[in-house]
Curated annotation (Swiss-Prot):
The keyword rRNA-binding does not apply. Homodimer. The keyword Disulfide bond applies. Residues 22-79, 114-171, 191-288 form the Ig-like V-type domain. Metalloproteinase inhibitor. GO terms for cellular component: plasma membrane. Blood and milk. InterPro entries: Ig-like_dom (IPR007110), Ig-like_dom_sf (IPR036179), Ig-like_fold (IPR013783), Ig-like_Receptors_ImmuneReg (IPR050412). This is Venom metalloproteinase inhibitor DM43. Glycans are attached at N23, N156, N160, N175. N-glycosylated. The lineage of its organism: Eukaryota, Metazoa, Chordata, Craniata, Vertebrata. One of its GO terms (biological process) is immune response-regulating signaling pathway.
């Protein structure tokens, strides 16, 4: 299983959605119950260190003024006495329209039979309504109000999508700037994998050479099929599964001169259509002079 990312999310809680900058609290959310204290950073400098209460570190900003506008991040001290990575930056502007959300696709900006395509629209303020827009439509194609600062939309058609967030109906004039546009397509290929030699050194006949092929999906785990290629042709070889289903090892045992050549790998979704990734980067194995 994948290890949980310890990076905390940083959210903005407002007491009044209709006037979101009049009374603001920053919430730094812990990922487990053993975290001790947290730090708030503003514009790259440490601002404050405070205790975590429950799973949330709270830092009250109050009314947003010229003195406290800026880019905020947070991090948390764990029971192992290690600091987590800093959170993604959150901009406190005190102005409207509100800062644009981010929009990303999982597993990617594609429509593939058998796979669910999700668009994640992530803002910064809690208690907002998220709207998903498709180019050519005047009104949102989907809307969602969630307790967090992110909404997830499932899409089934190609097109150009963007999103924004807004205050609830009681304050309809408070909106964010739209996100960047994502182009959702039916792909010819999937993105190429990372490909490298695990025991990278000079090789001699009789050695074991282990290649690693890794598909770069960060949101979740998928059931993937991997293949190894030598000089552009599929090569039957032992596939070594590991705990991470997004990666495999290919073992070449007792290699000889015939195993020299240019290697690459590909992957595809087992439950999806027969669309493979582009060829990975190429690694050349030369058993006479070393790799």
């Amino acid at each position: 299983l994948k290890a949980m990312d310890p990076t905390p999310p940083l959210w903005i809680k407002t007491e009044s959605p209709s006037t979101p900058w009049t009374n603001v609290t920053l919430l730094c959310v812990a990922t487990n119950t053993e975290e001790l204290s947290f730090q708030v950073w503003k514009d790259g400098e440490l601002l404050s260190t405070l205790p975590v209460v429950g799973l949330v570190g709270k830092f009250w900003l109050g009314p947003v003024t010229a003195d406290n506008r800026g880019i905020y991040r947070c991090r948390i001290l764990t029971s192992e006495n290690d600091w987590t990575p800093l959170s993604a930056p959150v901009e406190v502007t005190g102005k409207e329209p509100l800062p644009a959300p981010s929009l990303h696709a999982e597993p990617g900006p594609w429509i593939l039979p058998g796979l669910e395509t999700k668009l994640h629209c992530r803002g910064m303020l809690l208690g907002m309504i998220f709207d998903l827009y498709q180019e050519g439509e005047q009104e949102p194609v989907k809307s969602s109000q969630t307790p967090s600062a992110e909404a997830t939309f499932i899409v089934n058609s190609t097109g150009n999508y963007s999103c924004l967030y807004r205050a609830p109906a009681s304050a309809p004039s408070v909106n964010s700037t739209p996100s960047e546009t994502i182009h959702v397509v039916i792909p010819d290929f999937l993105p190429k994998a990372n490909f490298y030699i695990l025991n990278d050194r000079d090789f001699r006949p009789g050695d074991i050479v282990t290649f690693s092929c890794w598909a770069r999906f960060s949101e979740r785990e998928y059931d993937l099929e991997f293949k190894l290629f030598k000089d552009g042709q599929e090569t039957p070889v032992e596939v070594v599964p590991i705990s991470d289903p997004m990666k495999v090892f290919f073992d070449l045992t007792a290699v000889g001169p015939k195993d020299g050549g240019k290697y690459s790998c590909r992957y595809r979704f087992r439950n999806g259509p027969p669309i493979w990734s582009e060829d990975s980067n190429v690694l050349e194995l030369d058993l006479s002079t070393g790799q």
